[in-house]
A protein has these predicted regions:
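Charged helix-capping and loop-helix junction motifs
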Residues: 6-13, 44-52, 74-81, 105-110, ...
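Surface-exposed, active-site-proximal loop segments in enzymatic domains
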Residues: 2-9, 31-49, 83, 138, ...
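Active-site acidic/histidine proton-transfer and metal-coordination neighborhood
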Residues: 24, 34-191, 195
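Conserved, mostly hydrophobic/aromatic
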Residues: 18, 58, 91, 126, ...
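Glycine-rich, proline-tolerant flexible connector loops at the mouths of alpha/beta enzymes
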Residues: 1-19, 242
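Short acidic/histidine-rich active-site segments
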Residues: 266-274
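C-terminal helical cap(s) of enzyme catalytic domains, especially alpha/beta-barrels
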Residues: 279-301
Length: 301
């Protein structure tokens, strides 16, 4: 069906606004909807065509970078590389917690990069992989839900132990549910859940325990090691305090790694803490403003 962005009128208006407000398109977000039918998964050719559609739309909108999800099969990416080069749009695989660079999961994609020699595929780190702590807004939400302080301590101590030992990294598997559960079990989920049950934990306690596995810690050195394959970044954050500190994401250390590596791409603020504050409200614009100031301060340090 016809899309508005196909029209010259739409593009003239869009690029006119970009020029007027001094904006630069940074990265097009794509979602490979390979399960749009109830009775089947799209075949490889259909998925490649869907990726090509998004590459074309990204180009029409002035983007030279495209983000795709970790669930995108490697064959789909490889099958789209020639078209990506033709359209001058780089495909970036989002490295989202619990995934990480310098891991067996990433090695398969690195092999594809080296085998094909492509310059049109790389990684887009999400800064949620650099969490030293579980976000405080998540902890506070658990309290509002009725979690006990004893169980909160169990979960926080378990996360601190994972960080101290070093997270066991997730493996490459097209079955993301299986890979994620294996990752959780390898990182002490059973022991943590057993401790919560022994403490007579309730649903809120179990929610907080499960939520803790949506955050992870990677050494910022991973950025330096892989900088040749990083061209955009989701600067995830959860809660910016009045003093411009983020208690979960290690902003200063991560920005220092980007600086040392000579990174030239964008850091796009991605505010995710608001989803845990829907019952009490939050000024999201102020949160993003503080985050941008924190990034600026770290860059200028």
């Amino acid at each position: 069906f016809p899309l508005p962005i196909e029209t010259e009128e739409f593009r003239e208006q869009r690029f006119g606004w970009l020029e007027k407000y001094h904006l630069t398109p940074s990265c097009y977000d794509a979602f490979l909807e390979n399960r749009i039918f109830d009775n089947r998964t799209l075949c490889l050719g259909e998925q490649i065509n869907m990726m090509k559609r998004d590459i074309r739309l990204a180009s029409l909108l002035g983007f030279h970078n495209l983000r795709t999800l970790v669930s995108t099969p490697m064959e789909v990416i490889e099958g789209s590389l020639a078209y990506a080069q033709q359209m001058d749009v780089r495909i970036g695989l989002e490295v989202h917690a619990p995934f990480s660079l310098n891991s067996g999961w990433a090695d398969g994609y690195m092999e594809m990069i080296h085998r094909t020699g492509t310059k049109y595929f790389g990684f887009i780190p999400d800064m949620g992989i650099f969490c030293r702590n579980i976000p405080d807004v998540v902890r506070d939400k658990a309290r509002r839900m009725g979690a006990s302080e004893a169980c909160i301590r169990i979960v926080d101590d378990s996360y601190a132990e994972r960080l101290a030992k070093g997270f066991t990294k997730i493996k490459y598997d097209l079955n993301l549910g299986k890979a994620n559960m294996e990752y959780r079990m390898a990182n002490g989920m059973k022991e943590m859940m057993d401790a919560i049950e022994q403490a007579n934990g309730n649903d809120a306690d179990r929610w907080y325990a499960n939520a803790s596995f949506t955050y992870s810690w990677s050494d910022p050195q991973d950025i330096i090691d892989n900088i040749d394959y990083i061209f955009h970044t989701h600067a995830k954050f959860y809660n910016m305090h009045d003093d411009y500190t983020e208690t979960a994401v290690a902003i200063p250390e991560v920005i220092e790694a980007f600086k040392k590596a000579g990174y030239k791409g964008f850091l796009s603020s991605e505010y995710e803490g608001g989803e845990h504050l829907r019952d009490i409200g939050v000024n999201s614009i102020e949160q993003v403003r503080r985050h941008q100031e924190a990034l600026r301060a770290a860059m200028e340090k």
